[in-house]
């Protein structure tokens, strides 16, 4: 990965310079990355982009050309710029595994590092993880709507730039898509690629039939034909059937057809009848054309004959929910070996962070269904031989007690004392992990509209800490 050290908001660097001038830059602090609302109006968010975050951290450095540029801004002391010359990340980063399902206000990534290091990485960390998590979650919803039909990512040409196209394709496959049309993403991440022909192929020939015959001649064993250039039912499908019969007579198996416009439900049903009558009942009928999870769900409920889906613009841009509002907040500062918790208060209760150095534990019932998450201080333990009572962090009278349960701590080390502990996994393996994670959720949390809210509670110790800090801040204001 290229050096992205200067991929940051300008205010980070003057803060670093200020910390340096005040000689507090080496103070050890704890930051949490979390989000306040799920991606894509979903009941959950799939964490994605961890491998790229690790690459970013591993490549942090200030080469001479960067230092020269920073000097030209006339914002930084020469002493500070000399200090940056030897920059190396030396802290700890703990994160949930890539593909883990998470929920609002839970620490997704926790950084414990010298202040200047922890502050510098905020912007890049957020842009990497926010975007890929958004697209992975959107892809998961689209695939859920498809009810097991294969979904292909077709969005590169509509992505908001090359990086969004490349890393969006990665995230989409992690979220459940079977393949991408993005060749570079296929090469970079070793993920399946798909594609056949555009309307321009059909238009270039004197007739639609001639174009189909030419394509079948070149790709007799990978022949999927685009049938909506002129007239799906009166031209496209009949011509495709002629070509398919010829392929079959010569020992080849055609793949199917794609419809990219029109009334997809009606056209697919009628096309299916024609294919069945011609003896091609097992062929794929792929639909594209501005699809998303809601359109696919409506088509499936209408008994369409589509059995694979190419989803582009509304997936790669997450069109109806185009950002994940992940944030990165100071949670604690060390004074020697003592942890001093930090809290940000706000008139908006949603923006009051959970203080301290924390971890997240997931609680499962005996059927291995996720029942609740518990945010705890990092040194707390749970005795699973005893009943566990959790309560809503705001409506504290709402309690749930678990008796026959198991737990899993969600965070794993990415870096310890600057040493990388992360082990890369194949994308398809991460995709399977996502499916395993989703299988632990009740269907109510996966509804496309109005999903049930998953329980995320605070331990008694953390709740007491937060309440006391809020009380102290209120007293200070008086």
Regions found by a protein language model. Give the residues of each.
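Ordered alpha/beta subdomains of enzyme catalytic regions
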Residues: 1-221, 248, 253, 329-478
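Glycine-rich phosphate/ribose-binding loops and adjacent secondary-structure elements
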Residues: 200-371
């Amino acid at each position: 990965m290229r050096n992205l050290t200067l991929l940051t908001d300008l205010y980070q660097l003057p803060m670093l310079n200020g910390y340096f001038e005040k000689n507090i830059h080496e103070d050890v602090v704890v930051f949490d990355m979390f989000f306040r609302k799920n991606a894509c109006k979903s009941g959950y968010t799939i964490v994605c982009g961890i491998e790229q975050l690790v690459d970013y951290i591993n490549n942090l450095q200030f080469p001479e050309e960067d230092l020269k540029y920073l000097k030209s801004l006339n914002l930084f002391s020469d002493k500070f710029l000399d200090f940056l010359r030897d920059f190396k990340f030396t802290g700890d980063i703990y994160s949930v595994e890539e593909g883990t399902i998470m929920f609002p206000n839970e620490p997704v990534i926790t950084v414990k590092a010298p202040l200047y290091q922890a502050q510098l990485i905020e912007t890049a960390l957020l842009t990497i993880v926010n975007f890929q998590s958004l697209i992975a979650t959107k892809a998961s919803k689209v695939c859920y709507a498809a009810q097991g039909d294969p979904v292909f990512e077709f969005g590169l040409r509509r992505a908001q730039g090359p990086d969004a196209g490349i890393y969006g394709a990665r995230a989409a496959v992690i979220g459940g898509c079977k393949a991408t049309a993005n060749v570079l993403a296929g090469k970079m991440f070793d993920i399946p690629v798909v594609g056949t022909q555009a309307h321009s192929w059909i238009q270039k020939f004197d007739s639609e039939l001639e174009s189909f015959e030419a394509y079948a001649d070149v790709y007799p064993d990978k022949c999927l034909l685009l049938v909506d250039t002129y007239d799906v039912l009166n031209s496209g499908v009949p011509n495709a059937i002629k070509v398919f019969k010829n392929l079959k007579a010569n020992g080849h198996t055609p793949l199917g057809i794609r419809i990219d416009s029109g009334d997809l439900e009606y056209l697919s049903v009628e096309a299916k009848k024609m294919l069945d009558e011609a003896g091609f009942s097992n062929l794929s009928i792929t639909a594209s054309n501005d699809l998303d999870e809601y359109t696919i769900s409506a088509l499936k409920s209408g008994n369409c004959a589509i059995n694979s889906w190419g989803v582009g613009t509304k997936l790669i841009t997450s069109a109806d929910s185009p950002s994940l509002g992940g944030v990165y907040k100071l949670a604690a500062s060390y004074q020697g070996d003592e942890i001093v918790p930090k809290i940000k208060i706000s008139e908006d209760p949603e923006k009051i962070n959970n203080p301290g150095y924390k971890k997240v534990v997931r609680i499962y019932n005996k059927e291995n269904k996720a029942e609740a998450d518990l945010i705890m201080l990092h040194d707390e333990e749970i005795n699973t031989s005893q009943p566990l009572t959790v309560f809503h962090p705001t409506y504290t009278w709402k309690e749930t007690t678990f008796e026959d349960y198991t737990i899993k701590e969600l965070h794993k080390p990415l870096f310890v004392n600057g040493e990388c502990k992360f082990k890369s996994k194949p994308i398809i393996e991460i995709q399977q992990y996502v499916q395993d994670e989703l299988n632990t959720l009740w269907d109510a949390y996966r509804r496309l509209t109005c999903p049930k809210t998953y329980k995320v509670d605070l331990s008694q110790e953390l709740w007491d800490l937060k309440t006391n800090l809020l009380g102290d801040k209120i007293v200070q204001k008086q």
